[in-house]
Swiss-Prot record:
GO cellular component: cytosol
Protein family (similarity comment): Belongs to the ATP-dependent AMP-binding enzyme family.
In-chain residues carrying the UniProt-annotated modification N6-acetyllysine: K608
GO molecular function: acetate-CoA ligase activity; AMP binding; ATP binding; metal ion binding
Name of this protein: Acetyl-coenzyme A synthetase
Keywords (A to Z) from UniProt: Acetylation, ATP-binding, Ligase, Magnesium, Metal-binding, Nucleotide-binding
Residue numbers binding CoA: R192, G193, G194, R195, T310, N334, S522, R583
EC number: 6.2.1.1
Transmembrane region(s): none
PANTHER family, sorted: ACETYL-COENZYME A SYNTHETASE (PTHR24095), ACETYL-COENZYME A SYNTHETASE 1 (PTHR24095:SF14)
Binding site for Mg(2+): V536, H538, V541
Amino acid sequence: MVSDGQVFPVPADLARDAHIDAAAYDAALARVEADPEGYWRDIAARLDWITPPTKIKDVSYAKEDFRIRWYEDGVLNVSANCIDRHLPAKKDDVALVFEGDEPGTSSTLTYGQLHEEVCRMANVLKAQGVKKGDRVTIYLPMVPLAAVAMLACARIGAVHSVVFGGFSPDSIAGRIQDCASHFVITADEGRRGGRRVPLKANIDEALKHCPWVGKVLMIRWTGADVPLKAGRDIVWQDVRDTVSADCPPEPMNAEDPLFILYTSGSTGKPKGVLHTTGGYLAWASWTFWAVFDYKPGEVFWCTADVGWVTGHSYVVYGPLANGGTSLIFEGVPNYPTPSRFWEVIDKHQVSIFYTAPTALRALMREGDAHVTKNDLSSLRLLGSVGEPINPEAWLWYHRVVGKEKLPIVDTWWQTETGGMLITPLPGATALKPGSASKPLPGVKPQLVDAEGKFLDGATEGNLVITDSWPGQMRTVYGDHQRFFETYFSTYPGKYFTGDGCRRDADGYYWITGRVDDVINVSGHRLGTAEIESALVAHETVAEAAVVGYPHDIKGQGVYAYVTLKAGIEATDALRKDLVLWVRHEIGPFAAPDVIQWAPGLPKTRSGKIMRRILRKIAENELGSLGDTSTLADPSVVDDLVKNRAGT
């Protein structure tokens, strides 16, 4: 185990050339205290505004007067900020580099070409009746047209809801229903790790539950022969050239919605996280520039899918708002071999690489030779996102990929935060393996105990943020009360992150994981209630409880306790059926790693399942189960311990 004491100082040459060095970081901290309005105004001023904002911040976390507004009288367009304003100087510069699933498949889009594609798709949407404020569901593979679709929506003021390509038809339908989307953009199929993903077939299945969806715009990607529904389905390649290559950007108020992105909560139904136009883009743009210390002409590669917030903020909006070059990768880290990531870095001369600990742990297991046989000399900065990175993986990343020279920005943030909140700055922050380090200037984290009392100094507690920042989500779509209750009612006057955290004597923050009923599997947030609901929907299952447990590769695995209906035999075949069932109901990433048959579950006399005990059994911490005397039937625990499934 690495001690808190292991520190990697900022390299002198990097500090010298960085956008923000230690002195600039300290100056920003001082300024945000002395002149917060000026500080936040300057962050907004990095964007092009049709009408610059004069009202910078209007925020109250109080229940009786709850509101979050940033730059509320400003007017701008996100698409124009990501494309049009760069055209005079960067029309022929590469905006997007594409690397396909199969090696040897790659292409580029310049800012001029991106402008044309976005305008044409925006005009197709308008021709099909999509208007400002309409919700558009996007279910696409990791290809440049996914970014084009998002930017086309932003151009005309439509609100995009991107659904990850790994979600099942039922999950897609739930997301379409929740935001009452009438228009879907998809592809015939996706490619991933040498396999085909039946995107259009999944949409067709989902839309059986959403008959109000009037139009589906399908991109021919693999060329698969897929059925088209007359009057509903339109093929992008058939209509692209029928519309103008120019589409004026729609002026949008800073607080107009930009997108909805669904994320798992501690209750069953996913939440539609709503981000707005001005504050979100200002924060995504500034954090990209500051944290990645981005310099013109560099190739930036974030491996996240656009179906997740990391793909929104740091594949599309952050890089393009800065006039950068962003790499979009269709494939997976280990196809066709575990050298693939490193080959892509070499091939495209990637300067900044941002990936998830899950991928690093899997590649670390394959051995160093897959990395070292490639030329990674183009790399300048490494990043980690999605879950806490264990110190062993951090040190491997630093030693083998970074040649013991490159800084690692271990970034902590959430779908709800829009962009990074706690992270090193490469030119300013000494690094501790496994620590997200310190908050960005203007971000106000605190640790609290269960009663909400502030904990000072070196301590451990629940992580809250005591004041707003521009990228903060504004509401849960269609359920503002759920927004308040989920994030602001546990600790009144503070945003509750749902994460536990430790702070050391140097003020560095170490994220310890979720403290609510949410687990983080390979950087994907999954609500345990969602998986439990899927299991209980199976005809053989009477009851289910799901917890996370430590997993060598994924960070956390899914451990399910399942009580079968009377007369149903517990067999290995049924266990496999239940795993496939969850894959079908939610998606492959939610499939249980372990299913333990449970004749009964540990419940209090009021009927509440004691998940704390289930977590301890799953983690094999059998000596610390705690007091079981309050359970209705303590003998249930003995049975679960005796029949614990191996992990």
